[in-house]
UniProtKB/Swiss-Prot annotation:
Motif (Nuclear localization signal 2): 72-79
InterPro entries: Katanin_C-terminal, KATNBL1
GO cellular-component term (any): nucleolus
Species of origin: Homo sapiens
Protein's UniProt keywords contain Cytoplasm: yes
A Pfam match: Katanin_con80
Gene from which the chain derives: KATNBL1
Keywords in alphabetical order: Cytoplasm, Cytoskeleton, Nucleus, Phosphoprotein
GO biological process: one example: positive regulation of cytoskeleton organization
Effect of residue 28 to A: Complete redistribution from the nucleus to the cytoplasm
Residue ranges of the motif Nuclear localization signal 1: 26-33
Subunit (UniProt): Interacts with KATNA1 and KATNAL1; these interactions are competed by KATNB1 which has a higher affinity for them.
Protein name stated in the entry: KATNB1-like protein 1
Function in brief: Regulates microtubule-severing activity of KATNAL1 in a concentration-dependent manner in vitro.
Disulfide linkage: none
């Protein structure tokens, strides 16, 4: 009897414990979990049928699946520039965010040297292009047009001077000194003569062979006009040329022999003497001009 009573108490205690656990609040199970638990409780035959049906739906039309995969590979071409991406459709939000992060990361890790070199190349290319295509006349065309609005006469003089100097420069580059002298005599422009004569003077001082005695004789009328000018710069250019001619041909000019092979020496001596009789007053001019005139006068006095 005692044992039966003990067993009854034990059974009642266990029932209370079970009731207690049953009454405890349980964690809410989702519908998906309940559905899976129900499917697990299915019979083996039902489970096998379910598996076959599910697999059949997945494997259904494998050609279509391969076609989709092929199209996806065809769209995503590898680009040379990893930071350039074709804009994707709005439906792929996650992929867009990932691609945008990759683009920002790639842009952040680009070498600074490459960026500097490209910028330098652009700057250099732009500088070289402007230097090759733009001439000085086209570069300052706006400035010239603005200045010439109220100075049309001066603009014409400068244009004419520039054109004549270009012609003289063409003769000089060809080393056609006789043609250059003939051109200077024909235009009778003392401004162009003043620009060209110092070059010929340097050639005489360096004893260049392409400056002949005949060219020097032909230039004497222009030099006489320079010595009569009211501009001291013109006078200095003429005196420097006279000094160079006398020193270059001094051995022939100072020769006492009556037989002279070149007749231009006699012509040059006579013209120099007649020219200096009219312009010997230049020795009274103070400064650099008077010093050159005194040196020329000292040479010409020995010829009398």
């Amino acid at each position: 009897m005692a044992s039966e009573t003990h067993n009854v108490k034990k059974r009642n205690f266990c029932n209370k414990i079970e009731d207690h656990f049953i009454d405890l609040p349980r964690k809410k199970i989702s519908n998906f979990t309940n559905k899976n638990m129900k499917e697990v409780k299915k019979s083996p035959k039902q489970l096998a049928a379910y598996i076959n049906r599910t697999v059949g739906q997945t494997v259904k039309s494998p050609d279509k699946l391969r076609k989709v995969i092929y199209r996806r590979k065809k769209v995503h071409h590898p680009f040379p520039n990893p930071c350039y991406r074709k804009k994707q459709s709005p439906g792929s939000g996650g992929c867009d965010m990932a691609n945008k992060e990759n683009e920002l990361a790639c842009a952040g890790h680009l070498p600074e040297k490459l960026h500097h070199d490209s910028r330098t190349y652009l700057v250099n290319s732009s500088d070289s292009g402007s230097s090759q295509t733009e001439s000085p006349s086209s570069k300052y065309s706006g400035f010239f047009s603005e200045v010439s609005q109220d100075h049309e006469t001066m603009a014409q003089v400068l244009f004419s001077r520039n054109m004549r100097l270009n012609v003289a420069l063409t003769f000089w580059r060809k080393r056609s000194i006789s043609e250059l002298v003939a051109y200077l005599l024909r235009i009778e422009d003392l401004g162009v003569v003043v620009d060209c004569l110092p070059v010929l003077t340097n050639c005489l001082q360096e004893e260049k062979q392409y400056i002949s005695l005949g060219c020097c004789v032909d230039l004497l009328p222009l030099v006489k006009s320079l010595l009569k000018s009211k501009f001291e710069e013109y006078v200095i250019v003429g005196l420097n040329w006279l000094q160079a001619v006398i020193k270059r041909w001094w051995s022939e000019l100072s020769s006492k022999t009556e037989i002279i092979n070149d007749g231009n020496i006699q012509i040059l001596k006579q013209q120099l003497s007649g020219l200096w009789e009219q312009e010997n007053h230049l020795t009274l001019v103070p400064g650099y001009t008077g010093n050159i005139a005194k040196d020329v006068d000292a040479y010409l006095l020995q010829l009398h």
